[in-house]
């Protein structure tokens, strides 16, 4: 299957690690030029060097901007005024007791998880609609429809992404612009691997053993009973970025390993 992404430029926010990095790699493999984003220039350049060792012909551009701020978004617009594919992957999460979350933490999660995507899409979607061609993808979470009591602030922002995505899809009615949301389940990113290593101190478990125990004890409804790999999410997002996905629009799409017990 050819995804026909040659000649397309994609921006993947938060793409120096985890799911974002895997998405950037997958898009580059399919021929898209990819803008690599992170807050630290050193990390951005390191990621570009790493991806070029995997994909020698890849066209990769650096974007060391803090997109959790209005200033950072404006700097990005000046550097890259137009893209064909926008993947709003940037996000923060942190388990916290609801009664201990201060107002400024709620605002921080809103600024990074919501306003980064709002600001970027406001600029880039307008150009896509004018051209009648483009792709916007929000990376949410299964927490959007199965909120977690241990991360109420995070879950709320993920639910909000679903509403924003659907509203924006309708703005592009009658064009070949699509706006969708992907909801990954628990995924084995670097941060999650670190968490697994700290969950069972003194038990000398391998990462695989800790993963199996975590899934059994904390994600019992998962059908696959393992953590999703970033590459699995990346392949799905790459397909949604391609012309082959033109009939999928305004959708909230689960890639959660069957974690959410629902037929819809």
UniProtKB/Swiss-Prot annotation:
Disulfide bonds: none annotated. NADP(+) binds at residues 13-20. It comes from the Bacteria. Its EC number is 1.-.-.-. The active site is at residue 154. SUPFAM superfamilies: NAD(P)-binding Rossmann-fold domains. Coiled coil: none annotated. It holds the Pfam family adh_short. Keywords: Oxidoreductase. The keyword Metal-binding does not apply. Substrate binds at residue 141. One of its GO terms (molecular function) is oxidoreductase activity. InterPro entries: NAD(P)-bd_dom_sf, SDR, SDR_fam. Belongs to the short-chain dehydrogenases/reductases (SDR) family. This is Uncharacterized oxidoreductase YvaG. It comes from Bacillus subtilis (strain 168).
